[in-house]
């Protein structure tokens, strides 16, 4: 196993699945020609064992082994409630 496990922070978009959440990860990318910084969003499915998250919460997630076809991240903590 590697020592540096990837962790990300994002906003919960959906919690309608059982024990799963959809998290939006925002990053800023510089336009190659004009230099303007643009927001880019990535949606990630994460495992929420206790179903404790609601839409709008800010959460920390970490990478883990594949849990399903689309889930390979798990919830670490809820940073702030919506």
From Swiss-Prot:
Pfam families: Ribosomal_S17 (PF00366). Keywords: Ribonucleoprotein, Ribosomal protein, RNA-binding, rRNA-binding. One of its GO terms (molecular function) is rRNA binding. CDD domains: Ribosomal_uS17. It comes from the Bacteria. The keyword Transmembrane does not apply. One of its GO terms (cellular component) is cytosolic small ribosomal subunit. One of its GO terms (biological process) is translation. InterPro entries: NA-bd_OB-fold, Ribosomal_uS17, Ribosomal_uS17_bact/chlr, Ribosomal_uS17_CS. Belongs to the universal ribosomal protein uS17 family. One of the primary rRNA binding proteins, it binds specifically to the 5'-end of 16S ribosomal RNA. Part of the 30S ribosomal subunit. This is Small ribosomal subunit protein uS17. The lineage of its organism: Bacteria, Pseudomonadati, Pseudomonadota, Gammaproteobacteria, Alteromonadales.
């Amino acid at each position: 196993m590697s020592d540096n496990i990837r962790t990300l922070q994002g906003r919960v978009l959906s919690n309608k699945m059982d024990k799963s959440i959809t998290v939006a990860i925002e990053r800023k990318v510089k336009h190659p020609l004009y230099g303007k910084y643009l927001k880019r969003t990535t949606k990630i499915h994460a495992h929420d064992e206790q179903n404790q998250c609601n839409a709008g919460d800010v959460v920390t997630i970490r990478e883990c082994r594949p849990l399903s076809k689309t889930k390979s991240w798990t919830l670490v903590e809820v940073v702030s409630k919506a």
